[in-house]
């Protein structure tokens, strides 16, 4: 019987690269996505087309309301998504696009799914990005959450170890895109933008777009998605 794995899938290049990596293993894949604000709703739409390319056993989309977490440009309609011209302008501290406890919330849901379906492995596409300082993307965070997961679940207490896999954790965005291209990821079906237009065009100026464009440029490859 195949081992089961839960993959947190956002529709962006990082989680899609992880999906590609896991698809080349013997895991039975259970994808988990979240619809938490209008600014990420396009991501969820993209995922529907994306997973058709993969042998995903089940895809769950969980609707959660993070708008009470004010102070983030991704959940607070009163805060504009910052725009930049190049990587030199990107902030060196934790950006306003940080969503309080987002990965902790997402991983907690994944932990529940793991127990329900009998899986022991969770995959997430976090990495120590060259241009952001999200606290819930660090190696020590993943290690700590894994320790908590094994203390707070029945399977963990019973000695059946739950493992949080972050295969991109020490990679730069440039390295992730390079890896994905080598594996054959179709990045035209992904989206990174924090502030896309209603018809699905990426803004090309938010932190995520700038980092993505820079990564493709460094790989001497044209980004296949459309920008404003």
From Swiss-Prot:
Which Gene Ontology molecular-function terms are recorded?
Answer: ATP binding; ligase activity, forming carbon-nitrogen bonds; zinc ion binding
Q: Which reaction does it catalyse?
A: 7-carboxy-7-deazaguanine + NH4(+) + ATP = 7-cyano-7-deazaguanine + ADP + phosphate + H2O + H(+)
The record's EC number reads 6.3.4.20
- Entry note: cofactor: Binds 1 zinc ion per subunit.
Q: Say which enzyme class the record assigns.
A: ligase
Q: Where does Zn(2+) bind?
A: 193, 203, 206, 209
Q: What pathway, per the record?
A: Purine metabolism; 7-cyano-7-deazaguanine biosynthesis
Q: Where does ATP bind?
A: 9-19
What cofactor does its activity depend on? Zn(2+)
- Please list the GO biological process terms of this entry: queuosine biosynthetic process
Alphabetical list of InterPro entries matching this protein: QueC, Rossmann-like_a/b/a_fold
Q: Keywords on this record?
A: ATP-binding, Ligase, Metal-binding, Nucleotide-binding, Queuosine biosynthesis, Zinc
User: What Gene3D superfamilies would the database entry show?
Assistant: HUPs
What role does this protein play?
A: Catalyzes the ATP-dependent conversion of 7-carboxy-7-deazaguanine (CDG) to 7-cyano-7-deazaguanine (preQ(0)).
Family indicated by similarity: Belongs to the QueC family.
Name of the molecule in the record: 7-cyano-7-deazaguanine synthase
Say which species the protein is native to: Rickettsia peacockii (strain Rustic)
Lineage of the source organism?
A: Bacteria, Pseudomonadati, Pseudomonadota, Alphaproteobacteria, Rickettsiales
């Amino acid at each position: 019987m195949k081992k089961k794995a839960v993959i947190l899938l956002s529709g962006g290049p990082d989680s899609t690269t992880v999906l590609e990596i896991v698809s080349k293993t013997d895991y039975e894949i259970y994808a988990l996505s979240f619809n938490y604000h209008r600014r990420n709703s396009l991501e969820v739409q993209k995922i529907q087309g994306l997973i058709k390319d993969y042998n995903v056993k089940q895809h769950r989309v969980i609707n959660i309301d993070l708008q009470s977490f004010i102070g983030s440009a991704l959940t607070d309609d009163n805060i504009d998504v910052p725009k930049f011209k190049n990587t030199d302008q990107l902030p060196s501290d934790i950006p306003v696009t940080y969503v309080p406890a987002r990965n902790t919330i997402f991983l907690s849901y994944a932990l529940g799914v793991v127990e329900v379906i009998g899986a022991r492995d969770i995959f997430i596409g976090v990495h120590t990005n060259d241009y952001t300082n999200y606290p819930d993307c660090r190696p020590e965070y993943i290690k700590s959450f894994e320790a908590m997961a094994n203390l707070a679940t029945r399977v963990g207490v019973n000695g059946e170890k739950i493992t949080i896999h972050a295969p991109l954790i020490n990679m730069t965005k440039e390295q992730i895109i390079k890896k994905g291209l080598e594996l054959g990821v179709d990045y035209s079906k992904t989206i990174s933008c924090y502030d896309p237009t209603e018809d699905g065009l990426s803004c090309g100026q938010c932190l995520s777009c700038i980092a993505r464009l820079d990564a493709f440029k460094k790989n001497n490859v044209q980004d296949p998605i459309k920008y404003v």
